[in-house]
Amino acid sequence: MLQLQIASKNDLSVITELAKIIWNTHYVPIIGQLQVNYMLEKIYNYDSLIEQFEKKNHQFYLIKLEQSVIGFLNISSNSDSDFFLHKFYIVAESCHKGTGTSVLDKLQSILQPKSITLAVNRQNFKSINFYFKNKFKITSVKNLDIGNGYEMNDFEMVKHFN
């Protein structure tokens, strides 16, 4: 059975390990190993994750299938019912089986959002198509200098709920 479990600071090592596995599998062909290494160190180091938990009020969820953790997501609230999905990652073995759509459905039932916004790399065609399938629409193009000569070149996408 698929579950979303609220993560705590005790789960940081699980989140970091999953990020390494998923990013090295999924993102190396898109942005290259050096940028993957840089971003993993920048975003998933202990201090950065603690800041996301404590200062930025991000809520992390572990995605569990039976007893195994197969991914995680991170969301924050822009208002009472508008949310930003910062991270949404599932291990490759669990992709293309309806898992991602089921996770979004569960998240929607938990949050009862008016909207969910996210950013996705413009070359991440599999994820873009997944979000289109789940009724997200591109609202803008973003280019963000993340340091060390790297840029994030993203589409911002949003899904509105009734």
Regions found by a protein language model. Name each.
Residues 114-128, 132-137, 141-162:
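C-terminal "cap" of GNAT-fold acetyltransferases
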Residues 1-4:
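Extreme N-terminal starter segment of soluble prokaryotic enzymes
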Residues 6-12, 17-95, 101-110, 143-144, ...:
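Acetyl-CoA-dependent GNAT
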